[in-house]
């Protein structure tokens, strides 16, 4: 039973149901110091009803309460403080972790419901920059978390492969491009053309108009325009898939904006039939004043569609195809207004399922405090950064463990894992500065620090060379360090649920750091391999810790090497 539930039931019985179990569970607190117990109930809540001071109420409850399952229950001022039965709790938690293994913390909350996750979405014909990392790894981690809770995540790469920028790129290719040069080095050469034509279009309206015309041709199915565009797309995907391979990220579908180009007319017609489209300066809009939003521009004066038109078609397609219980969009915070408009237009059209669409925004990655911008050519390629992280990891592993057999493979797991972990430990709505020195450090709140704790446990278990009997686990928790680990292990299922509820992988990353820290304190304080009556209990404790560390890392898409 959950410890909050245990405390809440005992309290509700002690106060004759004046507050229900759920009401009590909602106000249970954790004392600032473990010396004051594991959980605390503030008696202020009962003062008005019972017409007594909180201090008196706390004292009466502490005397009356059934202490089964607790080491002791005491009144501390206006609080009732609960000390869990450490030995019984430890045995129960460790047995549960060792029995369930990687499935510890699994639940069937989702009951198999489909959850499309719109993620990654790099623009074709542009480098896969560090700026694309966040959507990719946050989306991948959320998918793993949701799968653990019984949902069916569907990872969709909504490639940026449609829009006026491709009309401009075709313009640049026709003016300056050389097929052989581009074939030899596709992304770099296309980036040069893109930066060059954007600078020209800013200065010369005719260049901008030419790009607009080429995009219009794409929308109208012009053979030449689509042939060039398809070539841009094919060479881009080769590069993207190589990078996804390094990141260890897979997708269920690659469906770019272009996939929906033949599905937009139906949604525009639907809006028209529902009298939601209004003309404004020759363009078609949906008025969203009642939502305190600007009008949504659905079609421009020249008939060209916009980002929101394509997203309306996308949302309708996903509902029809996947019948989702939730549809997530892992897209930067700068698009918040766009998603408000998108949901409002669907709501106006009578699609109440739009309530199940969730924008999962995130903060920006900078370097040296500067934003990455493809238009201006300020790009740091993610692949180069990953390769550099792996090199740095390998040098540190060489220094720590020169005889390690599979050094190169471990360096990849540590280097790539370090970059992913650093991103995911950052609160999703916050940005961060991309700093490889900090990311790949084996000290501090980093991926390598957590991986090293896991590898250290594996090393101890190999040295012990002893099978633990799950049915006969008995751990005498006589030190604070062991108790901190037990409490952390007990909390893991709740951590997973909280991460899912908040679409926040950082909750799991921070948990992994604190569990690794708790283990390292225990390791420094206790002779784990001392051959005494408690040896099996200690081995069971660290074995359970290893299982949960590995699973926490897996949920973040980070490997857990056995040796480092």
Swiss-Prot record:
Its main location: cytoplasm. SUPFAM superfamilies: Anticodon-binding domain of a subclass of class I aminoacyl-tRNA synthetases, Arginyl-tRNA synthetase (ArgRS), N-terminal 'additional' domain, Nucleotidylyl transferase. InterPro entries: Arg-tRNA-ligase, Arg-tRNA-synth_N, Arg-tRNA-synth_N_sf, ArgRS_core, DALR_anticod-bd, Rossmann-like_a/b/a_fold, tRNAsynth_Ia_anticodon-bd. Its EC number is 6.1.1.19. It comes from the Bacteria. The keyword Iron-sulfur does not apply. Pfam families: Arg_tRNA_synt_N, DALR_1, tRNA-synt_1d. Belongs to the class-I aminoacyl-tRNA synthetase family. This is Arginine--tRNA ligase. It comes from Lactococcus lactis subsp. cremoris (strain SK11). The gene is argS.
């Amino acid at each position: 039973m959950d410890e909050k539930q245990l405390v809440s039931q005992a309290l509700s019985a002690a106060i004759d149901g004046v507050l229900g179990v759920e009401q009590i569970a909602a106000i249970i607190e954790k004392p600032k110091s473990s010396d004051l117990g594991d959980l605390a109930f503030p008696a202020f809540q009962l003062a008005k009803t019972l017409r007594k001071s909180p201090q008196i109420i706390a004292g009466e409850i502490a005397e009356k309460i059934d202490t089964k399952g607790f080491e002791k229950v005491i009144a501390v001022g206006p609080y009732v403080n609960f000390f869990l039965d450490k030995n019984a709790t430890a045995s129960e938690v460790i047995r549960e972790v060792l029995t369930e293994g990687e499935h510890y913390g699994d639940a069937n909350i989702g009951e198999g419901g489909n959850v499309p996750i719109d993620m990654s979405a790099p623009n074709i014909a542009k480098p896969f920059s560090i700026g694309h990392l966040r959507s990719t790894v946050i989306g991948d981690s959320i998918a793993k978390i949701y799968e653990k809770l019984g949902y069916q995540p569907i990872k969709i790469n909504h490639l940026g492969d449609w829009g006026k920028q491709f009309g401009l790129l075709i313009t640049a290719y026709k003016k300056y491009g050389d097929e052989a040069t581009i074939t030899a080095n596709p992304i770099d050469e296309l980036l040069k053309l893109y930066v060059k034509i954007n600078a020209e279009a800013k200065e010369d309206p005719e260049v901008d108009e030419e790009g607009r015309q080429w995009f219009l041709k794409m929308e109208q199915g012009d053979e030449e325009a689509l042939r060039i565009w398809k070539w841009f797309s094919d060479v881009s995907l080769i590069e993207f898939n190589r990078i996804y391979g390094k990141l260890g990220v897979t997708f269920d579908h690659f469906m770019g904006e272009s996939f929906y180009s033949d599905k937009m007319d139906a949604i525009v017609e639907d809006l028209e039939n529902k009298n939601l489209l209004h003309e404004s300066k020759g363009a078609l809009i949906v008025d969203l004043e009642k939502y305190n939003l600007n009008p949504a521009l659905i079609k421009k004066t020249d008939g060209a569609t916009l980002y929101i038109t394509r997203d309306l078609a996308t949302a309708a397609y996903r509902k029809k195809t996947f019948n989702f219980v939730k549809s997530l969009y892992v897209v930067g915070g700068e698009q918040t207004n766009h998603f408000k408009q998108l949901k409002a237009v669907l709501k106006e059209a009578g699609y109440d399922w739009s309530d199940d669409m969730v924008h999962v925004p995130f903060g920006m990655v900078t370097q040296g405090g500067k934003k990455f911008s493809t238009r201006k050519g300020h790009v740091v390629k993610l692949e180069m950064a990953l390769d550099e992280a792996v090199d740095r990891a390998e040098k540190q592993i060489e220094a720590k463990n020169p005889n390690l057999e599979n050094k190169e493979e471990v360096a990849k797991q540590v280097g790539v894992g370090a970059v992913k972990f650093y991103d995911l430990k950052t609160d999703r709505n916050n940005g961060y500065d991309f700093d490889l020195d900090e990311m790949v450090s084996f000290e501090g709140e980093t991926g390598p620090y957590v991986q090293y704790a896991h590898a250290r446990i594996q090393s101890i278990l190999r040295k012990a060379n002893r099978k633990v009997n799950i049915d006969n686990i008995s751990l005498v928790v006589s030190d604070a360090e062991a108790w901190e680990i037990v409490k952390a292990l007990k909390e893991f299922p709740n951590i997973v649920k909280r991460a899912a509820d908040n679409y926040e992988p950082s909750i799991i990353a921070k948990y992994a750091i604190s569990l690794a820290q708790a283990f390292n304190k225990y390791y420094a304080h206790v002779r784990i391999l001392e051959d005494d009556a408690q040896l099996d209990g200690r081995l069971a404790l660290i074995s359970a810790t290893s299982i949960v560390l590995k699973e926490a890392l897996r949920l973040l898409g980070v490997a857990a090497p056995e040796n480092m």
